[in-house]
Amino acid sequence: MSIEDFVQAAQLFLASASQREFISIIGSAALALVSLSTAVLTYMSNRVLTAQVIDTRDQLMTKEIEVVRVKAATEESQKALDRIRRELDEREANIRKQEQNRRVLLQILKQSDEDVWIRHEPLLKPRDHDTRIARRRPIVMLVANNKGGVGKSAVTLNMAAFFDKNQLVQGKKRLLLDLDYQGTSSYVLTKAVDILERQSRAQMLMSEGASELDLFSARIGLNPVLPTTELVPSFYELARHEDRLLMEWLLGESGDDLRYRLSRVLHADIVADQYDLVLIDAPPRLTTGTINGLCASTHLLVPTSFTGVSAEPVANFLAMARAVKDKLNPNLKMIGVVETLTPTGSVSQAAKDARALARLTVERALQTYFPDASIFARDVPRMNAMIDDGLASQDDPKVEAIFEQLCTEIRGKLT
């Protein structure tokens, strides 16, 4: 082979090698491009899938949130529904209770005063009630009669005047508690010391939870007229309070026994330390105040005139007082009946006979219900001075002498 042939053959070979290499490079590039495309496609597919997953997740979260909202709304609606049901149940229960209360009140209205006040159950007497009444500290005297217009307030007022000067225990005070909603004693005493306001405070001592602090807030000093005596006044508004207290008690809305509220106040140790005598002026009927007075009293005094229209109510009152003693206050002592409004001038034989018959009616009632009690020897005559001035014993020597005799007799029975 010649050199030219060799060179030509070599060039052909090189040319052929470059072409193969180029083809190889092109092939490699093509494979790389395919791989890149595949990677790009894979990436893009993953992006699309990721976006779809995210979108799907967002949709699911949106649905879950909506479900939660619906559930919350449902629960709130259920709560509201339950609340409405409870309110309806409460209203229904209240209606039933009111209907039951109405039936109870209708039954009570058919009963006598004695059934309402004395036989009412349950009896929630304070544990130490009987012991405190028996110790007679202080003496608590109820001046009472179911008949009005018999001089009851005049007797109470002039007794207060006597004991203001003649203390049972030196150094202690007296208290006049006016439980008569007409407020006669309160009017006379407040007028005497220039107090013009007519305000009832007696109901404070019969409210649920009443204590000696209520007494100290309610009392009024009577200096200089009765310097050692204090007053708890009453007026017509007392009657409204009494009726409300009675209804609450009968319907079971109070947590204690209404009948013993005054007793807890008057027989507290601190009250016994301050007062030796409490005089209670009671109304002429069996009220919340009257029954509280009977349950709180150590002694009972009954003023009455000896007439046909007055004697029979006295017999009924003594029967009721005996029932109170037997059921509610066994240590209550009946000290006697004082005749009031006795005629001072000449009277007809018919009037004398009527008076004697009335006296006999009272004596028989005493013998039946309180055989240890009697009619006081000293009577209280009908006098203009006593009609015009409730505290006549302060100004009229004759009236003063009458009450000195009567109160001395009474004092001898305060044991």
Language model features by range: what are they?
Residues I133-Y181:
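Walker A/P-loop phosphate-binding motif and the immediately C-terminal alpha-helix
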Residues M1-R85:
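Membrane-aqueous junction of the first/signal-anchor transmembrane helix
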Residues V338-G390:
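Beta-strand-loop-alpha "switch" segments that mediate conformational coupling across diverse proteins
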Residues E76-N145:
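Extreme N-terminal, non-catalytic leader segments
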Residues L286-I291, A311:
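Conserved ATPase-coupling elements of RecA-like P-loop NTPase cores
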Residues G171-L176, Y181-F235, Q367:
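Phosphate-binding loop that captures ATP/GTP phosphates
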Residues E212-L226, E230-I280, R285-L286:
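Cytosolic-facing regulatory segments adjacent to core modules
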Residues T290-T307:
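Inter-motif core of Ras-like GTPase G domains
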